């Protein structure tokens, strides 16, 4: 809660709860159901999102809806045609399966998640990540794996269109380990784009300065991570990086000195 207070004091408009809100510990290979973790939120995540709104900000959460971990209980029970399949076996990368958005049951699953986080959890912003490589496609209901991939991608875009029709005020950020999926098939739908997961402000400057060659500045989200300690130029450098696009304010704001907070 102190970090929420500090973000509000800085003038942030959105406050996003990052990865991990759905699990008490390690979660990489078990994601896929996206239910609030009561060990992390004994009073429910709505208690926190309500507090965020009370502080004048719109709450958000991190999701990676296009995948299910190989140890996700729902994935174990789902039929193979929920996922990309090649040579008769589910395709997995980095311990995750790729969902096939041509399947109506998959659409029903992801819509349930979106409806729940918006209507029950009170979320108005989604950081939609994507951290796998689906490969050349799927052989399910296709004459070639490439056809399966293309039809899946078109179905995914159609699903996004439907989400924004149902929730026109919802903001969804396009993210893929940062900026690895920066294209305007997606960005003609998505609200904004993560430009990088780079955490070193000295390395981020070149990324921020060149992001406009791939994405409009008003969609280019750039991180600022002011550190707890250091000279004031570090804070200024962080903030100037982010001011080239959409400021994604991060860092331990509640633990900054008064001088460093004033610079932010």
Question: Which residues does each predicted region cover?
Answer:
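Active-site and adjacent substrate-binding regions of carbohydrate-active enzymes
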Residues: 2, 23, 37, 50-54, ...
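Generic domain-boundary/flexible-linker signal
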Residues: 26, 70-72, 137-139, 183, ...
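Short acidic-hydrophobic sequence patches enriched in Asp/Glu that either
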Residues: 40, 44, 152-155, 263
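Hydrophobic alpha-helical scaffolding
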Residues: 38, 100-104, 146-153, 225-232, ...
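Short secondary-structure transition/capping segments
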Residues: 26-28, 59-69, 105-117, 171-178, ...
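Active-site-proximal substrate-binding groove within the catalytic cores of carbohydrate-active enzymes
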Residues: 156-264
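Aromatic-lined carbohydrate-binding/catalytic grooves of carbohydrate-active enzymes
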Residues: 1-112, 125, 142
């Amino acid at each position: 809660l102190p970090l929420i207070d500090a973000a509000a004091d800085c003038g942030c408009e959105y406050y996003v709860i990052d990865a991990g809100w759905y699990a008490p510990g390690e979660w990489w290979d078990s994601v896929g159901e996206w239910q609030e973790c009561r060990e992390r939120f004994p009073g429910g995540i709505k208690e926190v999102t309500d507090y965020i709104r009370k502080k004048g900000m719109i709450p958000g959460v991190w999701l990676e809806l296009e995948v299910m971990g190989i140890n996700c209980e729902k994935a174990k029970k789902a039929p193979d045609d929920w996922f990309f399949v090649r040579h008769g076996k589910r395709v997995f990368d980095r311990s995750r399966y790729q969902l096939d958005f041509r399947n109506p049951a998959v659409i029903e699953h992801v819509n349930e998640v979106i409806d729940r986080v918006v209507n029950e959890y009170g979320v108005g912003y989604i950081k939609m990540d994507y951290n796998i490589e689906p490969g050349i496609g799927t052989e399910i209901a296709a004459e070639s794996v490439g056809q399966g991939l293309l039809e899946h991608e078109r179905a995914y875009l159609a699903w996004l269109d439907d989400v924004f029709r149902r929730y026109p005020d919802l903001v969804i950020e396009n993210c893929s380990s940062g900026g690895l999926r920066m294209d305007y098939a997606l960005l003609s739908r998505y609200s904004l784009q993560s430009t990088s997961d780079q955490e070193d402000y000295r390395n981020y400057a070149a990324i921020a300065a060149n992001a406009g060659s791939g994405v409009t500045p008003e969609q280019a989200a750039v991180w600022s991570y002011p550190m707890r300690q250091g000279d004031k130029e570090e804070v200024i450098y962080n903030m100037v990086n982010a001011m080239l696009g959409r400021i994604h304010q991060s860092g331990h704001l509640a633990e900054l000195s008064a001088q460093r907070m004033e610079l932010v």
